[in-house]
Amino acid sequence: MNPKVPMTLEGAQQLKEELKRRKTTDRKRIIAAIEEARAHGDLSENAEYHAAKEQQSFNEGRIAKLEGMLASAEVIDTSRLNSSRIVFGAKVTVIDEDTEEESTYHIVGDEEADLEKGKISISSPMARGMIGKEAGDSIEVRAPGGTRHFEVVEITF
């Protein structure tokens, strides 16, 4: 049995939408491309056919991966959380104690992480350093670039 992997409700919904799109729209489009390429004759030297088959393989692989992720997901509705401590699903505002730069991070599951959107994985060094802390606490994060220090400013859900 696969261990359960934490995932936000939003993250699970995004994966379900991608899965639905890949099973319906993308699959149909790829099948049509394969059929069209087959109509061109000799498949051994048909680049369009091979490209479409490669797309099909990638799409089916991604479908299998999405189904696996959703099957092992422990979906957590973060809107129902309320804690003074940092836990999975929290949105945490911190100040870098060296640069005085303020940043906000949303602690999410591994598959949802997107640093550009401020979403960090629960298994990242930053999130691991935050878990259990409260507003006003200092965080020490050991990362490949060295140790950094932050102060927790605000925790929201």
UniProtKB/Swiss-Prot annotation:
Keyword Thylakoid in record: no
Keyword DNA-binding: yes
UniProtKB keywords: Coiled coil, DNA-binding, Transcription, Transcription regulation
A Pfam family annotated for this UniProt entry: GreA_GreB
Coiled coil ranges: 9-30
Source organism, top-level taxon: Bacteria
GO biological process, one term: DNA-templated transcription elongation
Sample GO molecular function, one term: RNA polymerase binding
Assigned protein family: Belongs to the GreA/GreB family.
Record PANTHER family: TRANSCRIPTION ELONGATION FACTOR GREA
Main function: Necessary for efficient RNA polymerase transcription elongation past template-encoded arresting sites. The arresting sites in DNA have the property of trapping a certain fraction of elongating RNA polymerases that pass through, resulting in locked ternary complexes. Cleavage of the nascent transcript by cleavage factors such as GreA or GreB allows the resumption of elongation from the new 3'terminus. GreA releases sequences of 2 to 3 nucleotides.
Protein name from the UniProt record: Transcription elongation factor GreA
Taxonomic lineage of the native organism: Bacteria, Pseudomonadati, Pseudomonadota, Alphaproteobacteria, Magnetococcales
